[in-house]
C-alpha cells in the first residue's frame, strides 16, 4: 500500500494537459516540457519528475503520446510548463468545442468526480487520524468507520490524478456536440458549456446522489472531530459539495444528441434545455444551482 510520502505529486501537470486534448475529441500525440529550477535541485527530484510524466501518460491511457522535447532553465523557483499536441481522427476531423450543445441533448460524464476535492480536504487536516495511519501504518485512536482504500483513492486522485483520455475520442466518434474536462468543478464547467452553447443544463438530482454516495464515508472522516457538523445530513451535504464544486479530477463532461447511444465509460447526468431566462443556467433537479467551483481570475 502506498504512503503519503510516496504519493508526492508529480503527474498533475501532464494529466491536465492530456485532459485538455481529450476534451476536444483528439488523441494526444506528444508533450513538450519546459522545466526551470534552482541550481541546487537534486538529480533525484528531476528523475522523479520525468518518471511522473511518463507514468501519467500510461495511467491516462494516452498510449500514442510521447515527450518530444522541451527546455531546461535556471530560476529561483521550480516552474513547469507543458504543451500538449493531439490529432483528430479522419472520421471526426473537427474538434469538439464547448459551444455546440443543443436543447434536447443528453449530458453525460466519464471518469471520477469529487475524489480529488475529498483528498485535498484530508490533506489540509494535519490532525486527521487517517493521515497518521497511512503515514505510520499505525492506528491512532478511535476514528469513524471508513474503507482505507477509499482514503487512498481520494489522496491519489488529488496528488496523482488521471483522466479517461481514450473516452474523448469515443465521445467524438459518438457525435458529441460539446465537451469539457472537469478541472474546476462539475457545476462550474457545466455552466461554461451552458453559456457557450446558449442552453440551460439540468442535472439529475438522482445522478448526483449516485456520484456522491461513495464519498459519504469520506465526508464523515473529514468532519471527524468537528462535533457541530457530525450528523448524517452534514456528511451527505459535504459529499455532494465535493462532487458539485470540487475540481482537479479531470473527468470528461460531454453532451450527445438526444437518443444517441452513450459511449463506453459515460453515464447520463441530465439534459440540455431551451433557456428560460436571459442567461443560461445550470439546474439541479428543478432548482437553479448555486455557482460553485474554481474561478481563476476571481479576486481572493
Across the structure, where does each feature detected by a protein language model lie?
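Residue-level signal for inorganic ion chemistry
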Residues: 17, 25, 67, 104, ...
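Glycine-/proline-rich flexible loop or hinge segments
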Residues: 1-4, 31-40
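Glycine-/charge-enriched secondary-structure boundary and capping motifs
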Residues: 5, 39-66, 73-80, 85, ...
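Short beta-strand segments at enzyme active-site cores
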Residues: 24-34, 67-70
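Active-site cofactor/substrate anionic-group-binding motifs, chiefly glycine-
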Residues: 1-24
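Structural detector of well-ordered beta-strand residues that form the stable sheet scaffold
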Residues: 68, 108-110, 202
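Buried hydrophobic packing segments
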Residues: 14, 120-123, 171, 189-193
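Short, acidic (Asp/Glu-rich) active-site segment that either coordinates a divalent metal cofactor
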Residues: 95-169
